[in-house]
Amino acid sequence: CGGMDMDVKGGDIVVATGAIRMEGTSREYAPIEFPAVADLDVTNALVSSAKALGYTYHAGVVQCKDAFYGQHEPKRMPVSYELLNKWEAWKRMGCKASEMESAALFIAASHLRVRCGSDFLVVGNQERQEAGLDNPIVHDTEAAIKVAVEAVRRLIQADKQA
């Protein structure tokens, strides 16, 4: 994913608590007014796993979109005014990162009554780059995978004790 909040750096982990539904798939499952939120138990397991493994993490809302280049080159798009204005609104609302999967997963999971959560490796943060701040670019997803695997272990253990 790409960081949006200035505190989010490449190499950090983002745990999504909810997703802005700026994509089309989730609309096939539920009206746009229905929120795309992660399961609380899964979210807590992801956060506790990131902490236990010693990773820098950020939990919060992510922006979920269909178009990769709308984020990275919005001025080239016919709807640039809309993309730029919404991007600014999401930042002002404290959105942590931009990605392309969580909204549909959270909505489908709500419909199916199953637990779902998501964690991401932050590749970089274009906002930090534009501000001239340190912006490490990281492509190694091992940390996000380790967090997810540890979270599943914790969920299995909790389910056994329930």
Region locations from a protein language model:
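Glycine-rich phosphate- or other oxyanion-binding loops that anchor nucleotides, phosphorylated ligands
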Residues: 1-162
